[in-house]
Amino acid sequence: MKLKAVLLGILTAGALSAGEVSVAAAANTTYAFDEIKAEFAKLHPQTTLNVSLGASGALSTQIKNGAPFDIFMAADMKFADDLHKDGFATAPAKTYAKGKVAMFSVRGVDLSKGLEILKDPSVKTISIANPKTAPYGTASVQAFQKAGVYDEIKGKIVEAKSIGEALSQALKASDVGFIAASAMYAPKMAKDGCNDKPCKQGENFVLVDTKLYEPIAQGMVVLNRAKDNAEAKAFYDFILSDKGKEIFAKYGYEF
């Protein structure tokens, strides 16, 4: 009987420690999330982590309309802070990483010429994320305007729903894509866009001068439905931990 009681106690404790965390995350974090999920699972093997990726504005709208998320990881501070101001989050946003914009092409475009190459007649299509809903799209337009090329190239711009879709367009159809630099550090991109070699700065992509766009500080909030969710708090703390920063740093993010 004592053995049964002990076993029952162990099983009950295991059941109590199990749980789920639903995360809405900006599409630029896609590649980093493979490693984030793996490392978090090592620390919390009983927790199921569900991740939905998309444009920050679209995810924010879903949350306001009742989508059942516990954590929101935006591509900027505004979308995350606005959820707190509007009463959907438990506390103001905290910055978990700072992203960069990269110019990428698989069409042999001479990226060494910088944004000026976009005016060349050979460049007919330029993919960016929707600047109304995706902060990386906003940053791309800011860069075009500050560099003085926007008026001449605006007719070439193709807006994607998210930064992930902008990358997909750059791989499949567009001459140039303005994407999250994090994608360029992902092993998967070596196969998809860099001839089975690690993507090389100056060859496969160039970083857009950060002086041309507002810093992309990315904010995270715990949403109200997770205020008593210990697993959600554990994930939030993990993202802000040294290990979380180590993972993001691998993908070119800064802090």
Regions found by a protein language model. Give the residues of each.
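Exported/periplasmic ABC-transporter solute-binding proteins
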Residues: 18-43, 52-53, 57, 61-65, ...
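Gram-negative bacterial Sec-dependent N-terminal signal peptides
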Residues: 1-17
